[in-house]
Curated annotation (Swiss-Prot):
It comes from Escherichia coli O139:H28 (strain E24377A / ETEC). GO terms for cellular component: plasma membrane. Forms a complex with KbaY. Pathway: Carbohydrate metabolism; D-tagatose 6-phosphate degradation; D-glyceraldehyde 3-phosphate and glycerone phosphate from D-tagatose 6-phosphate: step 2/2. This is D-tagatose-1,6-bisphosphate aldolase subunit KbaZ. HAMAP family: Tagatose_aldol_KbaZ. NCBIfam families: agaZ_gatZ (TIGR02810), PRK15458.1 (NF012002). The lineage of its organism: Bacteria, Pseudomonadati, Pseudomonadota, Gammaproteobacteria, Enterobacterales. The gene is kbaZ. Component of the tagatose-1,6-bisphosphate aldolase KbaYZ that is required for full activity and stability of the Y subunit. Could have a chaperone-like function for the proper and stable folding of KbaY. When expressed alone, KbaZ does not show any aldolase activity. GO terms for biological process: carbohydrate metabolic process; D-tagatose 6-phosphate catabolic process; phosphoenolpyruvate-dependent sugar phosphotransferase system.
Length: 426
């Protein structure tokens, strides 16, 4: 499993290539990604976050072993080679247990790392940047690095125990703000300074030495930094290369290291390409993919209303709204304003809090009902043109079947195509 170290080697040799990481557990998003990678004969990096998947089940109800089984089964059903599939764990550390004392939180983090590594995840992002209940705020670089080194030692030992070799690839550091898009309205964003990036690296190098982990330094392939990209509910802060140029140049002095950029969702194709050229060569994408899924489903729901008598419709949008109002915990603290503003945010926000609700059984039933209603007879071309114009062009040229499922998957793949192009290199 050397796809990532090989990518870094090529990038360092001047290829201006990169890799994107699909950060989603939604079956249709994953199917879209696997099929896209298969068609383009590229490796595929799929990541689970410590919120989604942990030793207790996370919010998806899946342990790392469950998630791996789920992804591998899907890949196998689509004839995707297992050796081209890379699984990553994102923000692994005490993130889920910040309300506990540090000793307890880190004991849980040890077990989290063990469960990810034992399940066969090979790209491990060590993130101990968050303060626990009895910690100072913010933590010093040294404390963060010591905790990361402790987890790296656990990871190495677990990997040797289960697989007989230590072949993990690590990412260290964190971005600001918190994972998953900003809560507040943004207008400008501080880019990580070269000094801060150097301090993080040196603190980690020193902490790894103290743990006797010198030999793994070449397998620390990336540092997470903030290149100045973010999104909130209705705005995107676009990458401005000039603001990140000093940071970009700084990493050129490290022969086995590139940068990883989080929250790259909704950047323009030109910005994505420039990020990779500027050594932010691992691009994380998640909400933009489920946002595209949601767009396609809303479009199909509108088509359904044109074609199917009201009483036979799935009512997907209303079911979704009702469930989100019944169980507001995933959006309530994120969306503000009056009732109408919050209604719009629930449906259309870039932060896409609706992604937490797709697994709900009522919503899943409505989705299945929608697909059944539209699969019974061909969808009229003018309606595809009206509601899914990008897919219409491909349907007309004969490259896309106009079935509900294929329309959804292709709409998601339009986003993946932007990332693929950005990462291809020269």
């Amino acid at each position: 499993m050397k796809h990532l170290t090989e990518m870094v080697r090529q990038h360092k040799a001047g290829k201006t290539n990169g890799i994107y990481a699909v950060c989603s557990a939604h079956p249709l998003v994953l199917e879209a990604a696997i099929r896209y990678a298969s068609a383009n004969q590229t490796p595929l990096l799929i990541e689970a976050t410590s919120n989604q998947v942990d030793q207790f089940g996370g919010y998806t109800g899946m342990t790392p072993a469950d998630f791996r089984g789920f992804v591998c089964q899907l890949a196998e059903s689509l004839n995707f080679p297992q050796d081209a599939l890379i699984l990553g764990g994102d923000h692994l550390g005490p993130n889920r247990w910040q309300n506990l004392p540090a000793a307890q939180a880190m004991a849980n983090a040890d077990d989290l790392i063990k469960s990810y590594v034992a399940a066969g995840f090979k790209k491990i992002h060590l993130d101990c940047s968050m303060s626990c209940q009895d910690d100072p705020i913010p933590l010093t670089d040294d404390i963060v690095a010591e905790r990361a080194a402790r987890l790296a030692k656990v990871a190495e030992e677990t990997c040797l125990e289960h697989f007989g070799e230590a072949d993990l690839e690590y990412v260290i550091g964190t971005e600001v703000p918190v994972p998953g898009g900003a809560h507040e309205t943004l207008s400008e964003l501080a880019v990580t300074t070269p000094d801060a990036a150097r301090a993080t690296l040196e603190a980690h190098r020193h902490a790894f030495e103290k743990q006797g982990l010198n030999a793994i330094w070449p397998r620390i392939i990336a540092l997470v930094v903030q290149p100045g990209v973010e999104f909130d509910h209705t705005n995107v802060i676009d990458y401005q290369p000039a603001k990140a140029s000093a940071l970009s140049q700084m990493v050129e002095n490290y022969e086995t290291l590139i940068f990883e950029a989080h929250s790259t969702d909704y950047q323009t194709p030109q910005s994505l390409r420039q990020l990779v050229i500027d050594h932010f060569a691992i691009l994380k994408v998640g909400p933009a993919l489920t946002f595209a899924l949601r767009e396609a489903l809303f479009s199909l729901a509108a088509i359904e209303e044109e074609l199917v008598p009201a009483k036979a419709c799935s009512g997907l949008r209303q079911v979704l709204e009702d469930v989100m109002l019944d169980r507001p915990e995933y959006w309530q603290s994120h969306y503000h304003g009056d009732g109408n503003a919050r209604r719009l945010a629930r449906g259309y926000s870039y932060s896409d809090r609706v992604r937490y609700y797709w697994p709900d059984s009522q919503i899943d039933d409505a989705f299945a009902h929608l697909v059944r209603n539209l699969a019974d007879s061909p969808i009229p071309l003018p309606l595809i043109s009206q509601y899914l114009p990008l897919q219409y062009v491909k349907v007309r040229s004969g490259e896309l079947q106009p079935t509900p499922r294929e329309l959804i998957i292709n709409h998601i793949q339009d986003i993946l195509a932007q990332y693929h192009t950005a990462c291809e290199g020269q």
